[in-house]
Amino acid sequence: MPLKNVELVKLGGRIRYARKLLGFSQNDFATKCGLDRSYLGRVERGSRNVTFDVLCTICDGLTCDIATITRGIPHLLAL
């Protein structure tokens, strides 16, 4: 798998983990963020490249900053 795809999968996994940690279903979180549920699912699987604007929206929904979601989950636990 190309490095770019590996990083997208890691990012998507962090987003999924944080969403679940906060108790949101995929559908509820997508609605909260104003995203389509299927789009969010593709982002979480790493099969969709996420734009900076969408990443900001997702981080707002997760109440974390971009650095937190891109560096890894241990930083989320400190919130």
Language-model features, listed with the residues they occupy:
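Short, basic-rich loop-to-helix N-cap that marks the start of a DNA-contacting helix
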Residues: 47-57, 76
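DNA major-groove recognition helix of helix-turn-helix/homeodomain DNA-binding modules
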Residues: 53-68
